[in-house]
């Protein structure tokens, strides 16, 4: 279990600290304190269930950004086999903020693409904190075209604060790269299944999330701008980010209600970072089911299905 608790989890953190203290005492004592430990563990679980049953939108944003949340390579390691990473956009450079390559899912060849954030400072800098430059999106598009050529289903994993807004990225055509991905993904003649596993920020997320199915983990978010950015525009202060998060309706359950997301995938109690294996197994089963649904479609049906799904967004329900 993670030891990195968020502010709203402090009551849980205090209980977990007591449990850990008792465990250490028990190792050095002849007194049996197992019953007390079990009582506190049950209390901790009950408290966690209570807190997580009524999370605010801002608290969900914090969970989506949790530094110990599983990233792309954590899922690749647990869901896919024989992964072979492919590099470069064949035009400018290899952007480490987006990674992708061929792999096997249930023994069948697929293409896997996603944003990758870093764990330590060195990797965060190398991955640009999960904010892709244009060459990252062009690399992703190159891999998608390759997948289409060889008839491989495409699985994308979205986890980015947004596309990198630096001068160099803009000079090299950031907006063009994103727009081209949107247009070409809509026409791909292979199954495309997209999953938001953390942050789904703005065009940086959209550029690899045009699919036949869009899934979200329960404590992930998907929006046109960050809460801090929205608050800075509306109220001239990023301190009202919590209000912005609530107004933007960026949490998975609400987006599912609005018809933007096709499926919300449950997370382990306390969030995906509490149990990587359980989260990966749940996601694997969801991806397997969604692939079975779209895998029977012909290329023409896949394109039509994608167009219909996108056209339905924003239409009145019922």
Curated annotation (Swiss-Prot):
GO terms for cellular component: acetyl-CoA carboxylase complex. Pathway: Lipid metabolism; malonyl-CoA biosynthesis; malonyl-CoA from acetyl-CoA: step 1/1. It catalyses: N(6)-carboxybiotinyl-L-lysyl-[protein] + acetyl-CoA = N(6)-biotinyl-L-lysyl-[protein] + malonyl-CoA. It comes from the Bacteria. PROSITE patterns: COA_CT_CTER. One of its GO terms (biological process) is fatty acid biosynthetic process. GO terms for molecular function: acetyl-CoA carboxylase activity; ATP binding; carboxyl- or carbamoyltransferase activity. Keywords: ATP-binding, Cytoplasm, Fatty acid biosynthesis, Fatty acid metabolism, Lipid biosynthesis, Lipid metabolism, Nucleotide-binding, Transferase. HAMAP family: AcetylCoA_CT_alpha. Acetyl-CoA carboxylase is a heterohexamer composed of biotin carboxyl carrier protein (AccB), biotin carboxylase (AccC) and two subunits each of ACCase subunit alpha (AccA) and ACCase subunit beta (AccD). Belongs to the AccA family. This is Acetyl-coenzyme A carboxylase carboxyl transferase subunit alpha. It comes from Halorhodospira halophila (strain DSM 244 / SL1) (Ectothiorhodospira halophila (strain DSM 244 / SL1)). The lineage of its organism: Bacteria, Pseudomonadati, Pseudomonadota, Gammaproteobacteria, Chromatiales. The gene is accA.
């Amino acid at each position: 279990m993670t030891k990195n608790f968020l502010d709203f989890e402090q009551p849980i953190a205090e209980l977990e600290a007591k449990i850990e203290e008792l465990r250490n005492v028990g190792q050095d004592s002849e007194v049996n304190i197992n019953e007390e430990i079990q009582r506190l563990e049950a209390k901790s679980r009950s408290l966690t269930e209570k807190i997580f049953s009524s999370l605010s939108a801002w608290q969900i944003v914090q969970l989506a950004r949790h530094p110990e949340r599983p990233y792309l390579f954590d899922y690749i390691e647990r869901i896919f086999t024989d992964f072979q990473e492919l590099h470069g956009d064949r035009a400018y450079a290899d952007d480490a903020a987006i990674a992708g390559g061929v792999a096997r899912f249930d023994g069948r060849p697929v293409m896997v693409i996603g944003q990758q954030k870093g764990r330590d400072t060195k990797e965060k800098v190398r991955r640009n904190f999960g904010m892709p430059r244009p060459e990252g999106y062009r690399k992703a598009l190159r891999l998608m075209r390759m997948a289409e050529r060889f008839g491989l289903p495409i699985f994308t994993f979205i986890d980015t604060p947004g596309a990198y807004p630096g001068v160099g990225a803009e000079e090299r055509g950031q907006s063009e790269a994103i727009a081209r991905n949107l247009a070409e993904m809509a026409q791909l003649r292979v199954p495309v299944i997209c999953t938001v596993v953390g942050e789904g920020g703005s065009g940086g997320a959209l550029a690899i999330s045009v699919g036949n199915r869009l899934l979200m983990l329960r404590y992930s978010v998907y929006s046109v701008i960050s809460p801090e950015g929205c608050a800075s525009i509306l109220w001239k202060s990023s301190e009202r980010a919590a209000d912005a998060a609530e107004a933007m309706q960026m949490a998975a359950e609400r987006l599912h209600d609005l018809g933007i997301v096709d499926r919300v995938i449950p997370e382990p109690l306390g969030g995906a970072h509490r149990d990587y294996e359980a989260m990966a197994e749940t996601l694997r089963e969801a991806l397997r089911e969604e692939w079975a649904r779209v895998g029977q479609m012909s290329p023409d049906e896949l394109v039509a299905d994608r167009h219909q799904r996108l056209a339905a967004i924003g239409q009145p329900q019922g």
